[in-house]
Amino acid sequence: MLNILLTLVFSLIGLVIGYAVISARLKKAKETAELTLLNAEQDAVNARSKAEMDAEHIKKTAERESKAYKKELLIEAKEEARKYREEIEKEFKSERQELKQMDARLTERAASLDRKDENLSSKEQLLDSKEQSLSDKSRHIDERELQVKQLEVKKAEELEKIASLSQEQARGIILSETEKNLAHDIANRIKEAEREIKDRTDKTAKDLLAQAMQRLAGDYVAEQTITTVHLPDDSMKGRIIGREGRNIRTLESLTGIDIIIDDTPEVVVLSGFDPIRREIARMTLEALIQDGRIHPARIEELVEKNRLEMDNRIREYGEAAAFEIGAPNLHPDLIKLMGRLQFRTSYGQNVLRHSVEVGKLAGLLASELGENVDLARRAGFLHDIGKAIDREVEGSHVEIGTEFARKYKENPVVINTIASHHGDVEAQSVIAVLVAAADALSSARPGARNESMENYIKRLRDLEEIATSFDGVQNSYALQAGREIRIMVQPEKLSDDDVTILAHKVREKIENNLDYPGNIKVTVIRELRAIDYAK
């Protein structure tokens, strides 16, 4: 019984303890579950917050990438627009160039039509001349027939006389007639021999010229009257013109060159018939563009500097040509004069290159004939030296060249060659004849010369010479293709009233002495400067 009670007591105690343990575990499990729930809720909040932050970051990243993409698209669009604009400008330039070429072709075609018209006129004159010649020949034949009939009558009369003559008298008449016939035959044979000798001489001369021309490889580029200067950008045009045009007027008055500024992009055109003045203007303008300081004082400084530089270049041209032709021991003054011919043209042909070509041809001809080759080359090289100064000294270029060759003690053969190459005096040597032939070859070959260009340049040169012929004139420049003559006078010699009178006199002399199209503007400039230095 006691055992049962103890068992029950222990069982109850165990139940109580088990309940207590289970209750404690359940409580702990509940707390753990609540803590887990709280942690889960916190994690959910954190996850939501992180998701919102990630979403915001993704949104900002997308916006940034979108802006970058838009910017890249904008840059690409601008680049495409720039390329398209460049292509359009290139096509525009090409079309404009084609239009210029087309205009040049039309001008050339018009000139060709004019030439054809002149040829037709000359052919018509030739036909008229031939018709007149045929008429003259017909009349001459009629006259000859009349003479033959008269001779027949005369012979018949003579035969009648002979019939009544003695044997000795008849023999004398026959011998006299025979002598006349023989004299006629001898004269015909002499003429035939002379013609054969002339034909043979002409053939030999042509063979010599052909061999000399085949051995000479010359080239030539026609001279022009304009020079193009390229600009870094179009804004430079305004700086070249200057305020109220002071810069461009100063440059034109100092160089005597017409400066043309038009709508052509990044280009300025220098126009003038004097190549030396045009080259000085080009050098000055390029130096001004490179330097950046463009004002009248700087322009005057650079023009003077480039004049000195041009003197050095002229001497270098002369030395190079003398070396090319093989003419040693030339006087320095003669070398400088020959260098000036680089900037002189004759009917569009560069005179220095023409002189070198004549020297080479004369040397080749001399070698074929066994003459002094070096002397022939030297004489041919110097034959046109008078053209270097014929604008400044009175007389033809032949007279001036002869005088300078004599002054610098050139060989008498060279002096005679210069004097005789245009037939003014008699040639005294074979070399003089060879140089004259070489000069004719170099001048007359197709494409060497352009007569219309030479006539244009001569008209401008005559215009300047008329202006400088008056007392007190310092310089004169023909501008605007001869439509304006600008005259610089010495202020100490001429007053303001004298300037007006001078312009009137120049106008009258131009009207009396020159033939020209349109009008010519005469501008006389009198500039007085007073310079002092503060110390």
UniProtKB/Swiss-Prot annotation:
Domain KH: 225-285
CDD domains, per database record: HDc, KH-I_RNaseY
Cystine pairings recorded for this chain: none
UniProt keyword Nucleotide-binding, yes or no: no
Region span, Disordered: 110-141
Superkingdom in the source lineage: Bacteria
Domain HD: 351-444
GO molecular function: RNA binding; RNA endonuclease activity
Transmembrane portions of the chain: 4-24
InterPro entries, per database record: HD/PDEase_dom, HD_domain, HDIG_dom, KH_dom, KH_dom_type_1, KH_dom_type_1_sf, Ribonuclease_Y, RNase_Y_N
NCBIfam families recorded: HDIG (TIGR00277), PRK00106.1 (NF000997), RNase_Y (TIGR03319)
Family: Belongs to the RNase Y family.
Protein name as catalogued: Ribonuclease Y
Organism this protein belongs to: Streptococcus mutans serotype c (strain ATCC 700610 / UA159)
